[in-house]
């Protein structure tokens, strides 16, 4: 288990302004490298925990919905402030914020989080990744609903799939399978139990 999560090495209040600044940095970086504003992708990881100096927080964007997941008690406690800051940073780019942390928080923290919308409520859950459209089940699916961090690996598979047979074990949404088919695989088998 993780004993300490460091949000800042400066003495500063962890408040709305802090969250807004951190989320702006994360969003600006994704814009600069072409992830956040992309005509063939409307799905990306906005916050990747420690990678964005926000340990214990994951925020994935699926079209107009942000799915927020807390992995620490502190993130859970600040979820509403984080959601407000996220709304300000993203503006009209997101209409919904879904909080999904029932299974990710430490059981010893005596927290009883409930999944649910913190903003909006639309279940328009079609997300686009390199032109492919996926149904994302953030309500009941694993993690935030889709393994966003595997996008480049799926794209890489597409380049190697031509005339090959592909076995996609633990396929979940079948993302790798669709890329393999689009890449010209002669046969694709997808297996999952969830």
What are these regions (language model features)?
Residues 1-63:
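Non-catalytic accessory regions of SAM-dependent methyltransferases
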Residues 15-22, 74, 78-82:
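Short amphipathic alpha-helical segments
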Residues 17, 21, 25-32, 91-110, ...:
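A short, charged
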Residues 47-54, 58-60, 76-147, 155:
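Non-catalytic substrate-recognition/targeting regions of SAM-dependent transferases
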Residues 63-75:
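A short interface-forming secondary-structure element
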Residues 119-194:
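Rossmann-like S-adenosyl-L-methionine
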């Amino acid at each position: 288990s993780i004993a300490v999560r460091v949000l800042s090495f400066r003495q500063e209040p962890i408040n709305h302004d802090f969250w807004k600044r951190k989320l702006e940095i994360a969003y600006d970086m994704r814009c600069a490298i072409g992830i956040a504003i992309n005509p063939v992708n409307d799905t990306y990881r906005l916050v990747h925990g420690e990678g964005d100096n926000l340990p214990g927080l994951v925020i994935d964007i699926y079209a107009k919905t942000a799915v927020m997941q807390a992995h620490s008690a502190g993130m859970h406690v600040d979820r509403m402030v984080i959601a407000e800051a996220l709304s300000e940073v993203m503006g009209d780019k997101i209409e919904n914020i879904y909080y999904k942390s029932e299974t990710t928080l430490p059981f010893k923290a005596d927290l009883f989080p409930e999944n649910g919308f913190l903003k909006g409520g639309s279940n328009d859950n079609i997300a686009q990744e390199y032109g492919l459209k996926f149904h994302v089940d953030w309500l009941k699916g694993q993690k935030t609903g889709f393994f966003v961090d595997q996008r480049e690996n799926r794209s890489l598979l597409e380049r190697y799939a031509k005339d090959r047979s592909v076995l996609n074990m633990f396929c979940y949404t079948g993302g790798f399978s669709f890329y393999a088919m689009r890449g010209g695989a002669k046969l694709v088998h997808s297996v999952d139990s969830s």
